Amino acid sequence: MTMNKPKTNYAGYACCVICGLIVGIIFTATLLKAVERKLIHTPLIDKTIKDAYIREDCPTD
């Protein structure tokens, strides 16, 4: 009985570590995706805003 308790504790600890790593990987992946979206979309938004201002400033179109 004394030998089984440390094994179950180690198994539980390993399970917690694995679950924590999986959650951490998913969390960091979502953060990286959000940062990439912000970095990629902000220049596109700036370009569309500039294009809109140019279109408004030019009545010849």
Swiss-Prot record:
Highest taxon above the source species: Viruses
Locations listed in the record: Host membrane
Extracellular topological domain: 33-61
Main location: host cell
Membrane topology qualifier: Single-pass type II membrane protein
GO CC terms in record: host cell membrane; membrane
Zinc is among the record's keywords: no
Membrane topology (Cytoplasmic): 1-11
Protein keywords: Early protein, Host membrane, Membrane, Signal-anchor, Transmembrane, Transmembrane helix
Transmembrane segments: 12-32
Misc remark: The variola A45R protein corresponds to the N-terminal region of the vaccinia A40 protein.
Protein family according to the UniProt entry: Belongs to the poxviridae A40 protein family.
Protein name: Protein A40 homolog
